[in-house]
Amino acid sequence: MTSLPPSQCCIGGSLHEGETQGELTKFGDIPVYVSYPPDKSTHNAILFLSDIFGLALVNSKLIADLFAANGYLVVMPDLFQGDPVPVDHSPSFQIMDWLQGHLPPQTDPIVTATLREMRERLGCQRIGGVGYCYGGKYVVRYLHPGQLDVGFVAHPTFIEPDELKAIEGPLSISASAQDNLFPPEKRHESETILAQLDVPYQINIFSDVEHGFAVRCDLNKTRHRFAKEQSFSQGVTWFNQYLKK
C-alpha cells in the first residue's frame, strides 16, 4: 500500500464551530450535503469524500462550504449508509471492525451513483474530487476520464499502489510529517509512482501536525490552524489551475 489502512489515530481530533451554508438532500436513497457557489453555477463541481465521520461531522460541512465560496458546487455523499464512526464514540471503539463493512464493494456504488447524479441531474461538466483520510482512497480510485477530472487528497489512507499507478488526472497530496498512516517511506513510494506517470502532481508536507490535521486539528494551536488553512488553499489553488474551464 502507498498509505496504510485507517487505525485508532483516525478517530481523534477537535470539533470546529460555525454555521453551515449548504443543505441536506438525497440523490435517490443516498443522503448528500450540497453547497452552492455564490453564482449558483454547477459547471465546475467538487465531489467531497469525507473522513470516517461522514456527514455527522460539522468540520467537513464547513470545509465544503469554503470550497463552494471559492466558486465550486460541492456535493458530499454519505459514504457509510448511515453508519459513520460516531463523533462521540467510546474509547473502546474498534475501527478495524467497523471498516469491514465499508470497503470498496460497499463504497464504490455510492461514489458511482453520486457522480452520475452530479452529471445528469445537476449538469456538472467538470468534477474534482476532494478526499480526506478514508475518502482519499476513492478520489484516487475514480481519477479517470468520465469520473473525476482532478484530485486533491489530505492525509489519505488505504491506497493501493496499483490504484495510484492507474490515475489519469492531476493529483495534489497534502500530508503531515508525523502521520503514522502516511509515513515517509509511503510518501516516497507515492512520489516514485507519480514521477513515472504523465500527469501533474504535487505533495506538500506540513510539520507540527498529525493525521487528520486538515479536518480535525485544534484551531487554538497556531501552527495547526496554519497547516489546515494552507492545506485548504493548496486544494483551491490546484482546482483553480486544473479543474476550472
From Swiss-Prot:
Its EC number is 3.1.1.-. It is an enzyme of class 3 (hydrolase). Belongs to the dienelactone hydrolase family. Gene3D superfamilies: alpha/beta hydrolase. This is Hydrolase pyvD. GO terms for molecular function: hydrolase activity. SUPFAM superfamilies: alpha/beta-Hydrolases. Keywords: Hydrolase. Initially, the PKS portion of pyvA synthesizes C-10 carbon chain from 5 molecules of malonyl-CoA, which is then condensed with the thiolation (T) domain-bound glycine activated by the adenylation (A) domain. The subsequent chain release by Dieckmann condensation (DKC) could be catalyzed by the TE domain present at the C-terminus of pyvA and/or the alpha/beta hydrolase pyvD, installing the tetramic acid moiety. The active site is at 133, 179, 211. InterPro entries: AB_hydrolase_fold, Dienelactn_hydro. The gene is pyvD.
